[in-house]
Amino acid sequence: MSERELRVAPHLRRLPAHPSITPGQISELVERFFGRVRDDHRLDPIFEARVRGEWGPHLAKMKGFWRSVLLKTGEYKGRPVPVHVRIGGLENEDYIAWIGLFRDIVAEVFEPDARPVVIEAAERIAASLWLATSGELTAKPPAWPQDRGR
């Protein structure tokens, strides 16, 4: 145990969202997801317009983001809401396609017990981004596809 760990009370340590989730699985999730995004007629133009062929840095950032979300590493320091608000023109169908594709990859990468935890985090994030980009404070996010990835 490091000196820093000794100073943190056990009940205050941040635990992973699920004990079976590993950094390797998160890397695989991000790699597979964005590999399929690049083949998706709806999602690829949205991402490519911002990434402009520089997928390496984007994938590294997304891996850090998902490690922060699922493993509680705290390494991601970005601000995803303003980034997504600047995109403009996102439609409900874009979010539905994103969640549907994400669910498919989660089903391939994670253990069955971990899948609902990962999907719930993704849906919570998608709802937050949708609310920020919709501009409608009283609106409800679209219904996410429920029959995929679980």
Where do the PLM segments sit?
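Core of compact, soluble alpha-helical bundle domains
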Residues: 1-150
